[in-house]
Amino acid sequence: MMMLEESSHRSAQETYKEISDALDDAMYQMDSVIEKWLQRIATNNGISMAEARKWLKNAELDEFKWTLEQYIKKGQQNAFDQQWMKELENASARAHITRLEAMEMSLNQYAQEAFGQENKLTGDLLTQIYQDRYGHTAFEIAKGTGVGVTLGSINTEAVKTVLQNPWASDGKIFSDRIWSSMDDMKAELHKQLTRQILTGAAPDAAIKAMTKYVAQGVTSAKYRAGRLVMTEAAAIGNLAQHNCYKELGVE
């Protein structure tokens, strides 16, 4: 059992590394979006809300509509959150979009991609850990007592059902915590972006400030992801063992 726990721990560390890479990629993409759009809404006196609220026109609108189509295609391929997909589709159908809306939608898209990847990777990890621990427990019981010899391996769909049932006292599952982390980052970026525009900061200063906030948000998200992966991996392993004992009627 100790070897299995060590294997689960290594898998959790590997999953965290993949999540960390996805968040880093989102940070670079967000930095690019920030630089592009803050330069566009700049005047001689700095960035302004008046410029930010101007409608996209002609080539600028065509460019963003094409970008939205790419976001939608990626969402369809990666099973994005349905509410976000609806927002993208609604925006794609609109005749008028402001520069600020375009900027925020792009930032939110990259957040959705990164946290969506975190959700998938975490779910895959927990599914594998549950199946491995459940199967190993059944094997050990059968080897020692003969009980459970006919117990088959648990399938992926059955594990998904288990993962949708909260084990923590606050009633949240791993996905709830991931989307909460994403919402916190998006809310903070919105607040800081609005502040930079309202103060009329110089473009370079605003870009520097916003990329700092993105980096802070990613650092926080990484910390939460690391803690989540390790905590959930340990809990799901224990739950698999408990459920196997229960299924076999073993005390």
Would you name each region that the model predicts?
Residues I207, S220-E251:
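Acidic, glycine-rich two-metal-ion catalytic cores of nucleic acid-processing enzymes
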Residues M1-Q216:
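N-terminal leader/targeting and assembly helices and adjacent pre-domain segments
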